[in-house]
């Protein structure tokens, strides 16, 4: 398949998924919340693409949720060439993707994160994943979450779940705290064996995330909570913030390559505490 066609169909999918996820979010919220939509460009001087991020805050369900779509192209700074697949031969790149971060009002509902992307240098590949970060322990929910992920992964390859779960556990870990960020999920990168099969898997990851977050929210949105629960949520958000600013590759890469700062930092919670 021609590379330009691959770029078109992947970016179209990510944009369509943004619309679908946003539709579900606003249907769940069903009240006046603060909504901000920002269309951004990577460069003010040149055509290097851009994207659109949407943020909903101060809602009935969501304290803050961000859904970002991007389609950008340009050249990597020299310091990145050694670390990015295919960039040594030529610094040019093209990338498109979607990222979602949800911070909930009810501390009984976990924070949730998802992203998928397609990147082209002299090589092309998919990456992404999803993970859940509860403030209040719920073993049953954890079991159901991983069962759903395993079922989805097994439809593509029986080895995917174990491999991508391990990758997620290793990635979403705070070394200075010696603790995981949450209950894990799946994480994958440099997926480039077969475009058609890999793209189908990436689409299923997005569809599964939409199913999972809506199911969890609808199940828990009316659960009662206390100030103690909220304090635990604020502390957990502090850990979330530490990870995103200290270790998250996407955050560091975006800030170091001139990405949209507000879009990059949309993952941060609206309020957090440290003890």
Model-derived segments and spans:
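A long amphipathic alpha-helix within ATP-dependent nucleotide-binding catalytic cores
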Residues: 92-94, 148, 152, 156, ...
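A generic structural motif
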Residues: 6, 104-106, 122, 132-139, ...
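Compact, glycine/acidic-enriched structural inserts
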Residues: 122-166
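Long, charged, mostly alpha-helical binding arms that flank functional sites
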Residues: 152-201, 215-218
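Internal mixed beta-strand/loop scaffold within catalytic domains of large alpha/beta enzymes
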Residues: 51-128
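Glycine-rich, often proline-containing surface loops adjacent to acidic residues and nearby aromatics
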Residues: 94-96, 125-133, 179-193, 240-242
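Gly/Pro-rich turn-and-neighbor structural signature
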Residues: 2-85, 191-246
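Long, contiguous binding/interaction regions
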Residues: 104, 251-275
